[in-house]
A protein has these predicted regions:
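Transmembrane beta-strands of outer-membrane beta-barrel pores
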Residues: 30-36, 59-61, 80-86, 119-127, ...
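Short glycine/proline- and aromatic-enriched beta-strand/turn motifs that initiate or cap beta-hairpins
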Residues: 19-62, 205-253, 361-363, 367
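Residues that define the transmembrane beta-barrel architecture of outer-membrane proteins
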Residues: 22, 47-53, 72, 91-97, ...
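Repeated loop/turn-to-beta-strand initiation elements of outer-membrane beta-barrel proteins
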Residues: 64-67, 109-113, 157-164, 198-202, ...
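Residues on the lipid-exposed face of transmembrane beta-strands in outer-membrane beta-barrel proteins
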Residues: 28, 55-59, 99-105, 117-121, ...
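Outer-membrane beta-barrel translocator domains and adjoining extracellular loop/strand segments
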Residues: 38-43, 89-92, 127-133, 174-181, ...
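Transmembrane beta-strands of outer-membrane beta-barrel proteins
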Residues: 24-28, 74-76, 113-119, 162-166, ...
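Outer-membrane beta-barrel "beta-signal"
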Residues: 55, 184-205, 351-367
Length: 367
């Protein structure tokens, strides 16, 4: 959840900087979908269609940074979400706010198709309660993380923009408190946006080189980092204790250009919850140490990078979960080489824990 809060803070700071460098618009989207029962224990929960409305403040980039042109002018924004997730009696209503980025996959004249990735916070009024609401096995906390992944098609005519989209919206507390099977809702949406502050795309002389705010990384070289990670998670059964998680990540990163990078990494993880897994077996700290090899696709937006990765355990003596793990989230790189890491570690659709980390890139140099 802190990952999503910090993502919002980054977006708000960017919005204050965007008075002259971005085109501004207001957008409303209406969404209709269903609650996906991705675990058998959730089969009783979907009862009605899920619906939601989203009101967004939109910032359309106009080229003042080099990566804007590389991505064909991405869009940023902040969204207010309100909806019913498919079972009013058990799950109640959800309110959320999130920041997002839309990266064009196709852009031709007045038409564009975007990939959208958003992170934020959500609130629900019917969390799990052992007496009042024991059937809600999806969410045990009122405040949760919110994630939205979407494909969106937009046609713009002058100051008006019409869009349709497919997305999946997710609520979870990342196993901070159980039960936490999470809420997953596939949606289809239609929307309308109106430009309120028009700004033309910046024009560049091809002989003058890059835009006036170049990327803060160089390409065709490897960057080497180490990151220390701290987290916590609660284990089943319900009402159990919360355990700390300690980890180190050693990584090498290579960027192929403004739009893509590769990360190869080694993870060392000390998940204290394993001490109580199969409690009849005596364990040491060395016994519970997990090691994993990991690869990720990086999406660099200047110093802010999205991370989408997958790994496999090389050492996992007790195998309390699946042999494969996944990581999705974001990092921010400071000018002095320090990096801030906020990612969600999962085993497929099941959250493991949030990774709060701080690291250092040894050969980082700004241009």
């Amino acid at each position: 959840m802190r990952l999503n809060f910090l993502f919002l803070c980054c977006w708000l700071s960017m919005a204050s900087y965007a008075q002259t460098n971005f085109e501004h618009a207001i957008e409303y989207r209406q969404k209709l979908g269903f609650l996906a029962a991705h675990r058998g224990v959730m089969a009783h929960m979907p009862k009605n269609p899920a619906w939601a409305g989203e009101l967004s403040y939109v910032l359309r980039s106009r080229g003042h940074k080099a990566y804007h042109r590389a991505y064909n002018y991405p869009t940023f924004g902040g969204t207010l979400f309100y909806g019913q997730v498919g079972n009013q009696e058990i799950l109640g209503n959800y309110l959320g706010v999130y920041g997002y980025t839309e990266l064009p996959m196709i852009s031709f004249r007045n038409y564009r198709m975007d990939f959208k990735f958003g992170l934020g916070l959500g609130y629900n009024n019917h969390p799990y309660d052992p007496i009042k609401n024991p059937l809600n096995v999806a969410i045990a906390t009122r405040i949760n993380g919110l994630m939205c992944l979407a494909i969106k098609s937009t046609y713009q005519y002058k100051k008006n923009a019409f869009n349709i989209g497919l997305d999946i919206t997710h609520f979870s507390n990342a196993a901070w408190k159980v039960p936490n099977f999470g809420i997953n809702m596939p949606f289809v949406s239609v929307g309308y946006a109106r430009t309120i502050v028009p700004v033309d795309k910046m024009k560049f002389d091809p002989f003058e080189g890059e835009a006036r705010a170049p990327m803060n990384i160089t390409y065709k070289q490897w960057y080497y980092s180490v990151t220390a990670i701290l987290s916590g998670k609660q284990m089943m059964p319900i009402g159990g204790r919360r355990y700390p998680v300690y980890a180190l990540n050693f990584s090498a990163k290579h960027f192929f250009g403004h739009k893509a990078g590769l990360e190869l990494a080694l993870d060392l993880i000390s998940k204290q919850a394993i001490m109580d897994y199969q409690p009849y077996i005596v364990k040491s700290q060395l016994d519970i140490l997990q090691a994993g090899a990991y690869a990720a696709y990086l999406v660099p937006l200047d110093r802010f990078h999205f991370v989408f990765g997958m790994g496999a355990y090389l050492r996992d003596k007790f195998s309390p979960e699946d042999p494969l793990y996944h990581r999705i989230g974001a990092r921010y790189y400071l000018k002095n080489g320090l990096l801030l890491n906020l990612t969600l570690k999962t085993h497929w659709a099941r959250a493991d824990y949030l990774e709060y980390g701080i690291g250092y890139t040894f050969n980082y140099r700004t241009r």
